[in-house]
Amino acid sequence: MTTIHVTASRDYDVLVQPGLLDDAGAQIAHVLGTGRTAAIVAGETVAGLYAGRLAASLTRAGFRAVTFTYPGSEHCKTLATYAALLDFLAAHRLSRSDLIVALGGGVTGDLAGFAAATYQRGIPFVQVPTTLLAAVDSSVGGKTAVNLASGKNQVGCFYQPSLVLCDPDTLRTLPPEEYRNGCAEVIKYAVLRSAPFFDALRAEPVSAQVEHVIATCVGMKRDLVAADEFDRGSRQLLNLGHSFGHAVEKCSDYAVPHGCGVAIGMAIIARAAAKRGICTDDTCAQILALLRQYGLPTETAFTRDALTDAARSDKKIADGKLHLIVPERIGRCRIEMIPAADIPAWLADGGIA
């Protein structure tokens, strides 16, 4: 078993091991104690695949397991679904000594984490990621949120889990397009922090080295979270591709999934960085080539005006400036604070008409 310790306002471990789902109850009991009610939160598809096994594991360890299911899409990461989850917790009489277990991808983790942070002013929660994207990124770091009509993750807070349990075997049931979404976040980490990791992704597919990939990405995020838990400085580097990526997602009414949005966002910012002389043309070409190698999009049909309007609602805008993460070379990026009025020019340099 691989164990990565995260130091934050609440310290916790990320455990990575095939078959871990069936041992989840014992692992949770070791950290939180037993005899509690555990509310599993899962989208309908994931619930059908794994909620029964997780509930059985929890029951064996002495928990009372109940399950809240919802459709599971980005469209459902809303205040209405959040309210329904809170009502479910209250109906099952969960108290502050009980816990929530987020079983699924990033949407489920965001929703369940926000409910855990706010129900009765905070109850413990555990992340059990079942997508590559959640395993390498969103299950770690404590960001929780729901969406508003104006944009993604507009209502949320920082709330660290008590434990993260990652069973790579659950990734085997991912549809190919969902696996590709996770690969976008993996590539993000390589562009941000490690040229050798970037080369490893070129040489061998993620699927052939998935445990190593998860541990590597989580280790990188752990370091950034430890230095800047509340996203006021260096942790913002993790937003590489996200400002323009979120704009693409919003323009598509979330038909473009998060990973594909991030890939397009990385491609836009790489082209803009090369045009502005921040990185070389070769660095840009390498980023685009690796995204395409993994079947990820690097272009969008949305116009500059549409993306500008969407980007102006980004939660990363502060004091009229947008924080853009810009590559200097493979393994090194920097934070550029640009006036919101300059967004169209950056999009134009990124190839958006």
Model regions and ranges:
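ATP/NTP phosphate-donor binding region
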Residues: M1-L99
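Non-catalytic interfacial helical region
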Residues: L86-L103, A112-Q127
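Short glycine/serine/threonine-rich phosphate/pyrophosphate-binding segments
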Residues: V107-F114, A135-V136, A247
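Generic secondary-structure signature for well-ordered alpha-helical cores
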Residues: G151, Q160-V164, D169-P176, A184-P196, ...
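Active-site segments that bind and position negatively charged phosphate/pyrophosphate groups
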Residues: D199-A306
